[in-house]
Amino acid sequence: VSSAASDVYKRQQDYNRWGAIGYDWADPYRGDRVNSVLESKDKFNMEDMINLQIDYFSIPSKQIIELSKGHINNNIEHFEKLSRWNNVLDKNSIEAGIYIEWQTQIYFEFMKEYVPEPVQKYIEVQIYKVIEGISKMNSQQKSLFLDKTFDLAINSLEEKYGEDSSDWVYGQSNYKHVKIFHPLEKIVNDSIKDIIALKTYPRGGDGYTPGSTSNELNQRSGGSFRVVINTKDWDNSFATNSPGQSGNPKSKFYKNLYEDWGNDKFFPLLY
């Protein structure tokens, strides 16, 4: 049994209780990846289940790169990096940095070209619909759209981080990161800010990976409390939480969990 805010009913053809308030689902990719991992073998250990909660494999990246083969004419050396990439949005990955900027450009160009301007600010097209739309383009349309967006992505990366692609690493304070802000942090003096402020940590993933870190460059959503329970030996369970268990900035428990959480480290959950 798995769930990742996606439409689980599509897997149950005999489901007939449709008297719900609404039917809005997340993109299918997180759920699809979870199901793929769970179906890959019969037995899993604690480490496997921890790794699944922080899995950063990007199905959209795999689909977009496959669709683009034979259609990219400029910046070939950067596209070849993506062609050899493992599709994991690792915080230390240059390829992940290239891909996420490209995914962003693809989304905005698709909205600009295919969604009427008067309604653009009122609706949000899910990325699986964008990819579906690209897949239905003819060869010439694909080449024009994908080559244009890839050029925009590379130009944007060069403008933001410089022409040296080694500086395009995905996880960094100016790219994908997490920084939780205290509500008063921006208005208090430095002495108080030093007490209440939390650090910035580089992150991986996005809103379409099982380890969800949102589609904002500063992570805005995703799992804070996560738990893996060993029902045979309860004291061998593991969890994460963030930033701490106390709201008092002077308490040692105010942010003691934040660094490990920001680096995907679990702590023993003793019963």
Short names for language-model regions:
Residues E77:
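Active-site acid/base region of carbohydrate-active enzymes
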Residues S3-E66, N74, R84-Y271:
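C-terminal/peripheral segments of proteins
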